[in-house]
């Protein structure tokens, strides 16, 4: 419902950036509202920081779908920010409370991952001189492998389309979900 129409529209930000993060927010908000309705909740919450676009995406979608629901945004609460002024404090809290998270002080980046997209963010990753092939960054390859670990041979793939939507990979008819999973596996193993 979201990915294929976005691809058909050629929706790419600044001519190069897939909308993998931004397209997910309305879908997440839609599902949050559905769950809130099912459980007769009066509010929904998101963890978007108060400085990015995600908060706007979540809240506009929620307002359109369920204007009666309160939206709780902890990162806009001063007491919350005083308790957790940065990643270190949040990671320390999670460790103390035995809350499993992938971030650590050695790997202090955040990850956004969904069926279409994966991205990482942290101050050190914004450095254009960063050597992302260094062994310490190998853990960032979640959907793919380092180019050094990818096969040296190309793999030929056929895609079948119907009404602009991919319906088969290598001759095997699949649901949209299975198509995306198959393409992620094929692309991922080639780095």
Question: How should each PLM-predicted stretch be described?
Answer:
Residues 1-191:
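Nucleotide-activated chemistry modules centered on ATP-dependent adenylation/adenylyltransferase
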């Amino acid at each position: 419902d979201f990915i294929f129409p976005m691809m058909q529209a050629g929706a790419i930000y600044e001519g190069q950036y897939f909308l993998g993060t931004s397209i997910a927010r309305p879908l997440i908000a839609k599902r949050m509202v559905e769950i809130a309705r099912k459980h007769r909740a009066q509010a929904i919450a998101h963890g978007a920081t108060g400085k990015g676009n995600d908060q706007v995406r979540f809240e506009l979608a929620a307002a359109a779908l369920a204007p009666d629901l309160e939206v709780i945004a902890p990162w806009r609460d001063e007491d919350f920010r005083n308790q957790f002024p940065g990643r270190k404090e949040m990671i320390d809290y999670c460790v103390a409370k035995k809350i499993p998270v992938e971030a650590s002080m050695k790997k202090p980046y955040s990850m956004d991952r969904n069926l279409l997209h994966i991205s990482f963010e942290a101050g050190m990753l914004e450095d254009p001189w960063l050597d992302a092939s260094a062994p310490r960054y190998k853990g960032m390859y979640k959907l793919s492998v380092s180019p050094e670990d990818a096969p040296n041979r190309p793999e030929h793939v056929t895609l079948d389309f119907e009404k602009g939507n991919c319906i088969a990979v290598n001759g095997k008819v699949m649901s949209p979900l299975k198509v995306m999973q198959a393409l992620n596996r094929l692309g991922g193993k080639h780095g």
